[in-house]
Amino acid sequence: MLRSKLSSLREYLTPINHNSNFLTTGEISPEEFVKAGDYLVYKFPTWQWASCPKDLQKLFLPTDKQVLVTRHVPSHQRANEYFEGEFEVEIDEKDRDLALGNESNLKNGENGENDDEAEYGWIRSGRSSSEKGTGEVLDPQRVEEVNDIDELIDETAEGEEEEEEGEEGEGEGNGNGADFHADDDADYDDLDIVQGSHSKLRRYDLYITYSTSYRVPKLYLVGFDANGIPLLPQQMFEDINSDYKDKTATIEQLPVAHNTTSVSIHPCKHSSVMRVLMKHQRARREHENVAENMKRLSIGSEDHKEAMNHIRRLSAGSKELAQKQEEPNDSEIKVDLYLVIFLKFIASVTPGIEYDYTMDAL
């Protein structure tokens, strides 16, 4: 708990910054945190603002908006079970460079030290066991975004990745009785399956607070088993992706309650991840705006020529584009969406906790 106390001290000593620069740094001010929280609560009522004991309140936040909370979020399988299978997706090299800040791949490309996956533009990612054999078609954009997030988080790690493989056997009914007992045997088999599923069920209370030291949201997890008994930190770590649990997860006292142990997702790299995610979303909106304008223009018209000139101005490295990105426009991401995008990022760290239903807002 020494790290938890040091973190609390750092939060206390860091001065509050009220300047708004989330588009360029990925950081937000307390006022922007409240604004983004209001939007999250409005769009998704399972999230609610809450207060906390007076001695734990942050004076720069409203007393009734100290923390965002959603309760009893289900988790039916552990993280290592969620990523039982693997699949490969080919993505554009420019998108890889964008997600990595144009650093990792460019360096590897210059030195010729790419491994097989990097050389051919492949990224390996996990696949939910529930998706196996269903014939479901995956959305390439969604897969690409998740892979971008994985690459960003993995950059912060030191040493080699450790793979964890866990297999759990489940009991099955024999069903070998006489014909007049067949239905009863089937009922018992179904009961065993239901009981086995219930024993795996966990529920989480999720808390989002504002970190003054990093100027980003910070997520805390408090878990319970199927009987409502609080989970130990080691048990909660089972619901965090094994690639990240030793890199970004920390055992801390919940800062908005007394004597409550939680697991936090450390926010040291949140701002850089958020900056790249917002850049992706902004580029997508710019592309949609141009496509919409093209639909309204007739081929061969003077307006069409103007549209083509506009597309050229949107090319990478254009000074005019750089100036426009500094000014608010229809393609810019508003701060209201910050926490929605933040939860999209967190979903890759805690894949088995089923709270990532915010994607329709983007």
From Swiss-Prot:
Residues 129-145 have a biased composition (Basic and acidic residues). The active site is at 268 (glycyl thioester intermediate). Its main location: cytoplasm. Residues 272-337 are annotated as: Handle region. Residues 146-171 have a biased composition (Acidic residues). GO terms for cellular component: cytosol; mitochondrion; phagophore; phagophore assembly site. Residues 101-186 are annotated as: Disordered. Coiled coil: none annotated. GO terms for biological process: autophagosome assembly; autophagy of mitochondrion; cytoplasm to vacuole targeting by the Cvt pathway; glycophagy; piecemeal microautophagy of the nucleus; protein targeting to membrane. Keywords: Autophagy, Cytoplasm, Protein transport, Transport, Ubl conjugation pathway. One of its GO terms (molecular function) is Atg8-family ligase activity. It is found in: Cytoplasm. Residues 82-198 are annotated as: Flexible region. The keyword Hydrolase does not apply. Monomer. Interacts with ATG8 through an intermediate thioester bond through the C-terminal Gly of ATG8. Also interacts with the 40 amino acid C-terminal region of the E1-like ATG7 enzyme. Also interacts with the ATG12-ATG5 conjugate. Belongs to the ATG3 family. The N-terminal region is involved in phosphatidylethanolamine-binding and is required for ATG8-PE conjugation. The flexible region (FR) is required for ATG7-binding. E2 conjugating enzyme required for the cytoplasm to vacuole transport (Cvt) and autophagy. Required for selective autophagic degradation of the nucleus (nucleophagy) as well as for mitophagy which contributes to regulate mitochondrial quantity and quality by eliminating the mitochondria to a basal level to fulfill cellular energy requirements and preventing excess ROS production. Responsible for the E2-like covalent binding of phosphatidylethanolamine to the C-terminal Gly of ATG8. This is Autophagy-related protein 3. It comes from Lodderomyces elongisporus (strain ATCC 11503 / CBS 2605 / JCM 1781 / NBRC 1676 / NRRL YB-4239) (Yeast).
